[in-house]
Amino acid sequence: VVCSPTDTHAQIVQEAAAAGKHIFCEKPIDLSLDKIDKTIDAVEKANVKFMVGFNRRFDPNFLKVQETVSSGKIGKPHVLKITSRDPSPPPEEYIKTSGGIFMDMTIHDFDMARYLMDSEVSEVYARGKVLVDPVFERAGDWDTAVILLTFENGALGVIDNSRQAVYGYDQRVEVFGAEGMVMVDNNTPDTHIYFNRNGAHSALPLNFFMDRY
């Protein structure tokens, strides 16, 4: 199990493969495509099992979305929407070595987009801004991002990310197709809704990925 800092993943995986060990590695494998390719080559040469930690693929709710799309129940998929927002920013030292919002956070959404749509991405347009905390700008990163995807099957995708959602860990997915739509909302500790003269009140989303996934 490789869950060390990102810049050590590739070397450790290569050494584990050379030792004949099956490997589970936290994402990403590395920030360099060249090192990633060399690592994959080492794994294939060693003929060991290798898995990267994209935990959302095993979430029961997201699995239902994937099953619904792949079964054809909503027809040809047209638009995918993913909302992924953390409850609070990570420490500055982590930000500096994380590889940035796209490699550290959006990477899960890129994986989920390809998984749900069963199609590779042909075009990517992304914009990032610092709207939450100046610490991200000092680290050369962004804390807010919007990504537009075009898939090889012709569908479109939109991902929006933020490093801070004050109401909790915001994880939502929607796939709209020619014959219908499937969606997953946030998980909450309970589903009760309390109404009074000030409005409707319900539980906040689960705190973070440790609880959500």
Regions found by a protein language model. Name each.
Residues 2, 24-25, 50-52, 81, ...:
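Hydrophobic residues in well-ordered beta-strands that form the structural core
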Residues 11, 38, 64-67, 112, ...:
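Alpha-helical elements of Rossmann-like donor-binding domains used by nucleotide-donor carbohydrate transfer enzymes
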Residues 92-156, 161-167:
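Rossmann-like dinucleotide-binding domain that binds NAD(P)(H)
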Residues 38-55, 67, 75-82:
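Rossmann-fold dehydrogenase core element
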Residues 26-28, 54, 165:
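Short beta->alpha connector loops at strand-helix junctions that form conserved
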Residues 1-42:
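Beta-loop-alpha module in the N-terminal Rossmann-like domain of NAD(P)-dependent dehydrogenases
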